[in-house]
Amino acid sequence: MEPCEGTVGGATKKPKPSPAPPIAALGDDFLGEILLRLPDMASLASAALACKQWHRVASDPAVFRRFDALRRPPLVGFLLTDRGDMPSPYRSPNLFFVHATRNPNLAAAAADGDFFFEDLPAVDSDDEEEGYDWDEWRLRGCDGGRLLLSRGRDGLDLAVYDPISRTAVFLRPDGVFRACTHVVRYAIVVDEADGSFLVIGFDFRGAVFSSRSGKWVKINMERVKLEKGDVTYEHEIFDKIHSFSSDGMAAGRFAYWRSNTKKDRHFNPVERIMVLDTTTMEWSVITAPFPAGESYCVADMPEHGGLCLFSSKEQCLQLWVRNSVGGWVLKKDFSLLNEWMKKIRRAEWMKRVRVLAARAGYVYMEFWSIRKANSYFLVLNMRTMKMSVFPNNPEDPHRGPAFPFFMRLEPLLGPDEDQNVHLDV
């Protein structure tokens, strides 16, 4: 009888498999790629507690930003304002907060949040004028879980407020801007990796405050980069900069201000956007590729070269990207009208889509009607094209600036620190 296969000459001992390399043998780059595949922030926080190397890699700003960009942003809700931001009258806008999360941790944070900044101290004001609330805090911007607030006739008393932890940083740009009634236009940009922030402002001059240095740095607004061929605009740079009468918004590493040019049947107006790249500190003014009056936002999309635009045309969403020579190209154009939106459009006269923000593959919009105060907030996943809907039912319309509010993520703690990491969102 033939011997069974594998038994010739007696039994043989199987070789032992090579031992797995120790954790310490993994290079930082390879370990970073592994950490990027973890499912959520809670898992990343747990990994950061494993050892010093894992904490160093997990808390590296480059890894942290990539991890955050690959996952759904921790949306808590939408902070709405009425027209209180208009040049006249100078008053604090009325606020309204719409809860917009189904995550229990985020919902709990929203329930305890001071989104109307009622815990900030009220001070006596020397500016007494009937009908004006100079001593009230006024919302000027929002990014990374922080609110930028101002008060006083000149709007130069500033606060950066975290409504979840109810902590604030107070600052005043003494000697930077003129003391003139609400002339300065502001914006705030928060670094998600470490929680540091920049406050940007400009009137006849520009300045940036960094929380890392604790100082204001003046910027020469005459060095604003203009689009090639816009000769007329170059001669009118002084006047045109001051046509940006509203506060700015944040979009990743960019801060931007919209001219909000209105449609006019008597001439062909254009919409211009002033942009500050906070990595290079370069200012520029660009012309929007769509007609004036359309709703839009700026987006920071590295996969499309950085600065991009999302605009709405009726109930369609358009993505604009830059080509090799700096011109605008329509990358995507698709209808938002699913069966639900068609039904709402007929039943509630909802026809307008306001684009609020775009972040990490998600676009945040408001579906509203000029006839009614209520609306619906839409969160579109650009990868799956699935859309979440959150109803908004206020008594009065809030058509001023609106801000998606995202949970501010705490820095990752190391294995030798005795505090827990609160990133379970």
Please name every model-derived segment:
Residues 1-425:
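N-terminal entry/capping and adjacent linker segments that precede and initiate structured domains
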